[in-house]
Amino acid sequence: MTNKSENIKDEKEQYPLLSMINTPADLRKLPVEKLPEVCDELRQCIISHLSSNPGHFASSMGAVEITVALHYVFDTPSDRLVWDVGHQAYPHKLLTGRREAFASQRTFGGISGFPNPAESEYDSFVAGHAGNSISAALGMAIADSLTPGREERKTVALIGDASISNGIAFEGLNNTSNNPNNLLIVLNDNDMSIDTNVGSLHRYLSNLTTSAGYNRWRQRLYQFFRSKWLINDSGKGRMLRFNNSLKALISGSQNIFEGLDIRYFGPFDGHDVVKLVKILSEIKDMKGPRLLHIRTVKGKGFPEAEKSPTVWHAPGKFNPLTGERISESSASDVEKWQDVFGKHLSALADKDDRVVGITAAMITGTSMTHLFKTHPERAFNVGISEGHAVTFAGGLAASGKRPFAAIYSSFLQRAYDNIIHDVAIQGLPVTFCIDRAGLVGEDGVTHHGFFDLAYLRPIPGLNIAVPSDAETLRQLMSWSLTQNSPLAIRYPRGSAPEKIIPSLSAGGEVDDSVRPEARRLRGSEENNSRVAVLAVGPIVKEALTAAENVAKDGIEVDVFDMLWVKPLDTELLREIASTHKCLITLEDGMIAGGFGSAVEEFLHDENIECEVIRLGVPDKWIAHGSVPQLRALCGYDSSAIEKVIRKVMKDL
């Protein structure tokens, strides 16, 4: 009890205003002059927590003032805020009853790092992927307009200048004026994606200015006509279109948003909270779709983050006083999977001028930085537009190039039709390098990459490989250049062992024309083992650990690195099934429709009788936590595999 009292006292001393805010209603009791102090305390709170419990730092630091202003002006949670992506939502969480739980964010059993309606009534819609906020908020706003008694309810979509370049964001913008609604879009323009922002829209926004005097003139003109009964709200749209045309005539250009009949305000300083409150109060009750354009600095309030916003997007642990980042990496020289990919892609480009690389706003995350340095003319960052990335790759392949499209597994879902229609049907030689496959850990449910095997397997002509080590990844990338069909290579987040078992290395110079194959990692044909574990990817290491543990009790288990999910190594499968009583399949992905399902389907179709136990992600949503914690939760860490082996052996 004493400790709790002391903690409360310390919090009040450290955050005198923030400690009194348990809900936005408490925030709204403060005089507007106090809001800059609230913003300062929010930043200090974010710095204090994220320095020891890492998360999305720079985005949240840049969105403090707009978050405070929105909760101050709007009656949340009755009025709804819809966050795009959610990287910037930490100030929102701190203001909406989750301050005491904030230390647990992104940890197993703690609060999520992203907005989620299951967590709080203040989180109106799931966020994690980019571009959905406008469409979701528009649906809410139109639903309110159709519901008696809710016509005056307010809905706000908060979207960044990188996210708004999404196809779905444009689709949402294009539909905002089709039906009556009171949607407000706040465009948070910080000149950044996770990496540097790209594209024509980004350049357009950088040059966009609108006279505040013009906006005042237009509102006064409308009020004048309305007072004289010359126009009413139903005719306002026609007047706005006339005003837009007049503005275009005067300025020589048309604002893209006003061209879509969206009332535009801005750009304004996104770090002047008092002014933001004034502007939001003025436009809050205006009818029809509106867009407020604010300019912010990613990482605002922390000098190191302002200088290097890409590095400080999710910087890991750091010293809150000096800004020095604290490395938790060991002395091991083991490379990360994305670095193996990035370096080998650059090496392939050195030898083959057909090689090109594509990333969707993840230059650093996918390690495409290497290709951008060595062959910038053949490296393409298309922004947050995975569908375009895939079809663009298809166009390159159709014209003789060999594109490697490096896209996170969770985000590749957004391009499913493009994979089928624009690559697979034509059999184009696009190599999909699927990063962050499997359980990704602390980013949780919106970012896990465990669906790819299940959604790619049904596509005719698309081969799928899951390397267990760096050597095999490089072999697959090199081999793909000798093929004339699409290939998907998936690999997880984290360190890539050079060789899963050194003695089984290919050794010497690898023949790029030779297709890498499945291999036995443990056991032999002579040991008469009755159980075999068939794994794909580096998760096979868990199987090897389990096999070593049961071997101490005289239980022998064979372990195979199967590598190929499609096509299956059917000859090897027949051999294994004929010499074992039970096959345990293991994958870092969904059980339903994945590698294990492929094995079961093959055995069934071939009328081969052999028990199959499938291990992987079960049919449920998996929250956030460390990867080891989540593997244990899903039942496919080494301990869980060991239990399955012991039970099978007991029952045989």
Over which residues does each language-model region extend?
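Generic long, charged, amphipathic alpha-helical segments
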Residues: 381, 547-548, 553-576
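Long, well-ordered, tryptophan-enriched scaffold segments
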Residues: 4-12, 191-341
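Peripheral docking tails and interdomain loops at the edges
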Residues: 318-320, 325-333, 441-443, 463, ...
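Glycine-/acidic-rich phosphate or pyrophosphate-binding loops and their flanking alpha/beta elements
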Residues: 251, 278-281, 313-314, 336-351, ...
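Non-catalytic terminal/interface segments that mediate subunit docking, oligomerization
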Residues: 80, 297-412, 418-428, 485, ...
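Structural signature of the thiamine diphosphate
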Residues: 236-304, 429-434, 452-501, 513, ...
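N-terminal amphipathic, basic-rich helices that act as targeting or association modules
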Residues: 3-95, 256-262, 269-277, 290-293
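Cofactor-binding active-site loop characterized by glycine-rich and histidine/acidic residues
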Residues: 56-179, 337, 355, 360, ...
